[in-house]
């Protein structure tokens, strides 16, 4: 792989990031890596402060929330990212504080895996489109209030629902809220939309996986006020007759993984995925 000669560091604005930051700077200095910027994730106009292709790598210090926000803000800058976890689960972050000094020199020397992943574009009626990395959740926002809505692929009706809402996820997001709702895990590079109705008044509202080459449209039928939430951070109200359009975003993003990275190992260790309830080695 390409040698890393320069890096930008983006860190959490709220967590204790200093130890990880110091170790990243120390590793970069030892490898003679040019550090272009060190910025908090909430830096104003961060996509303009960090120039397009300005660095070979962005190191992101934080949890999954910091990682998702950084990806969304910098997706058009075309710089691969590597996450360093100082949060809880850290499914998108491969390193932890203890592994920085050992693994970063390997990455800087070109020993890493590069993985390209698709993202989502979400538009409500004629509003400006939003970028989604994990998922968009369409829900009533009110306990015991159900929504009547229809789901389309382009103009073709897929299904009608009376339920609490629906999750539309990327493959990356399938290991998050979508998985918690009973959806399957999907390999994160797959070009798909994963659709999961929430608490539907139907015995056959199963998850649906569709290619992301065609847009998904959700149309709200009843007068109950509803909301959409994108990646757990963008929250917008929608009303009767509103249409939510989910499409493949024109920009993808790339993650750098350390040598030996295994997605299924991450699923097993971080999600306890596929783990038996009893010891099968006995």
Predicted segments with their positions:
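Short glycine/serine/threonine-rich phosphate/pyrophosphate-binding segments
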Residues: 17-18, 66-70, 175-180
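ATP/NTP phosphate-donor binding region
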Residues: 1-57, 61, 97-113, 123-130
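ATP/nucleoside-binding phosphotransfer catalytic cores, i.e., glycine-rich phosphate-binding loops
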Residues: 130, 138, 143, 154-157, ...
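N-terminal glycine-rich "phosphate-gripper" loop used for MgATP/nucleotide binding
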Residues: 60-64, 71-74
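Proline-centered loop/turn at the N-terminus of a beta-strand
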Residues: 78-80
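Gly/Ser/Thr-rich active-site loops/lids in small-molecule metabolic enzymes
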Residues: 160-163, 167-204
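Catalytic core of DAGKc-family lipid kinases
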Residues: 89-164
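Short glycine-rich anion-binding loops that position phosphate/pyrophosphate groups of nucleotides
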Residues: 63-66, 89, 172-174
């Amino acid at each position: 792989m390409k040698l890393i000669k320069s890096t930008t560091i983006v860190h959490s604005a709220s967590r204790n990031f200093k130890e990880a930051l110091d170790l990243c700077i120390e590793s970069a200095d030892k490898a003679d890596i040019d550090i272009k910027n060190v910025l908090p994730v909430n830096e104003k106009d961060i996509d303009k402060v960090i120039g397009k292709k300005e660095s070979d790598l962005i190191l992101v210090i934080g949890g999954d929330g910091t990682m998702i926000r950084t990806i969304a803000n910098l997706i058009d800058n075309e710089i691969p990212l590597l996450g360093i976890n100082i949060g809880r689960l850290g499914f998108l972050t491969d390193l932890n504080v203890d592994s920085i000094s050992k693994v970063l020199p390997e990455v800087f020397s070109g020993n890493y895996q590069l993985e390209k992943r698709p993202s989502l574009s979400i538009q409500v009626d004629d509003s400006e489109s939003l970028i989604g990395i994990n998922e968009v959740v369409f829900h009533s926002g009110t306990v015991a209030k159900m929504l009547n809505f229809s789901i389309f692929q382009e103009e073709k009706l897929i299904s009608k629902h009376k339920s609490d809402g629906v999750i539309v996820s990327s493959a990356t997001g399938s290991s998050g809220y979508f998985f918690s709702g009973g959806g399957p895990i999907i390999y994160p590079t797959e070009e798909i939309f994963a659709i999961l109705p929430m608490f539907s008044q139907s015995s056959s509202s199963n998850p649906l996986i569709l290619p992301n080459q065609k847009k998904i449209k959700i149309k709200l039928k009843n007068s109950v006020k509803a909301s959409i939430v994108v990646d757990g951070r963008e929250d917008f109200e929608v009303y009767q007759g509103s249409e939510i359009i989910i499409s493949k975003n024109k920009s993808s993003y790339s993650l750098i993984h350390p040598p030996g990275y295994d997605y299924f190992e991450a699923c097993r260790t971080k999600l306890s995925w596929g783990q038996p309830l009893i010891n099968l080695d006995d």
